[in-house]
Amino acid sequence: MSSSPDLPKTHLALVLTSTSAPPEVKTIPTPQPGPGSVVVRMLISNIISYSRDIYDGTRKYPFPTPLVIGTSGIGRLAATGPDAVLLKPGQLVFVDSFIRGRDDPSAAFLFGVHEGYTEGSKKLMRGGGKMQLMPNTPKSQ
């Protein structure tokens, strides 16, 4: 059963629209959990030491824009998809930025960093397998 107690309509996110401009804090729609997914309210996330080189284009990592910036971290489940059996809102979880396709292990990417090199990984990062981290920010309505 899908569960989304007090899930805000919007949340704040650090969004990169171009490597020629700095990222901006924007209000964006909060994702709703579908089958096989959850929404995580992030408590803490690491910052990669070479982040500036990624997001200013120095490293030439392929990624779609606009890009919600974020990597691995720890958070609490804010909502669960309709098929969740063990996961419950409020549970503490670790979010790994390394994402693999459920039906194709070669379709892999680093969330918020690199879309990978296969068509499958690009499809996942560009929306076929949406992932967006919801920061621990005050609720927006």
Regions found by a protein language model. Name each.
Residues M1-S20:
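Eukaryotic N-terminal low-complexity, Ser/Thr- and Lys/Arg-rich leader segments
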Residues L12, I74, L92, K139-Q141:
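Ordered hydrophobic segments in well-structured contexts
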